[in-house]
């Protein structure tokens, strides 16, 4: 089952958190569609912002966006001008006050979506797909990932018949729920047609409790920038907790 299902959806509530945090009730469908409109607008407005994830929270009077980006300066704009424009447009869409929190991604090579988008840009520039895949894998493993797999589908290299090719390094334990695996899908529109890109990145195994939304609600009101702790390496195969209270037994005094 782990081989077929979306790795992020499979781990929701275990090591992964939701990207839409609110209660909709009877208006659930309308709010879900509105969330999709918000994300599409922000990504279209800042296509080169290096945005990996947008988490949306809702209250009665306010909509809060938490944007994880590798290029916070591009998202904020000069003197915060870009963020202010985005707030005005989103207020028209939602009809509520909008708050935007911005967190910087220190290691974009560990974000599956950013890796996929990077490969897509190289394919559009007619760089060899094998070279693009190998460079992405080397860069991700160099910054501390335990495994990465990249799969491309389409008319690779301009071939007459579409096919699938993939490269993998390290391990990707898709059946292990405590495994922190990032997954993303991207597309590259080339002169030969559309090429699909799938990326899996294994960051390590998570033991004990974990904050599923570490960056949500931590920033001050308005646009702010901070470091992103979400892609900090978890316990990468470290020792398990001792059972039976072995670590809590007091040493007897002789």
Curated annotation (Swiss-Prot):
Xref: Gene3D superfamilies: 3.30.300.20, Ribosomal protein S3, C-terminal domain
Feature: compositional bias, Low complexity: 215-238
InterPro entries (alphabetical): KH_dom, KH_dom-like_a/b, KH_dom_type_2, KH_sf_prok-type, Ribosomal_S3_C_sf, Ribosomal_uS3_bac-typ, Ribosomal_uS3_C, Ribosomal_uS3_CS
Gene Ontology BP annotations: translation
One Pfam family hit: Ribosomal_S3_C
Transmembrane segments: none
Keyword Nucleus appears in the UniProt entry: no
CDD domains: KH-II_30S_S3
KH type-2 domain segment(s): 38-106
Keyword RNA-binding annotated: yes
This protein's GO CC annotations: cytosolic small ribosomal subunit
Annotated stretches, region: Disordered: 215-254
Biased composition, class Basic and acidic residues, residue ranges: 244-254
Keywords associated with the record: Ribonucleoprotein, Ribosomal protein, RNA-binding, rRNA-binding
GO molecular function list: mRNA binding; rRNA binding; structural constituent of ribosome
Cysteines engaged in disulfide bonds, as pairs: none
Task performed by this protein: Binds the lower part of the 30S subunit head. Binds mRNA in the 70S ribosome, positioning it for translation.
Subunit details: Part of the 30S ribosomal subunit. Forms a tight complex with proteins S10 and S14.
Family: Belongs to the universal ribosomal protein uS3 family.
Protein name: Small ribosomal subunit protein uS3
UniProt organism field: Cytophaga hutchinsonii (strain ATCC 33406 / DSM 1761 / CIP 103989 / NBRC 15051 / NCIMB 9469 / D465)
Gene: rpsC
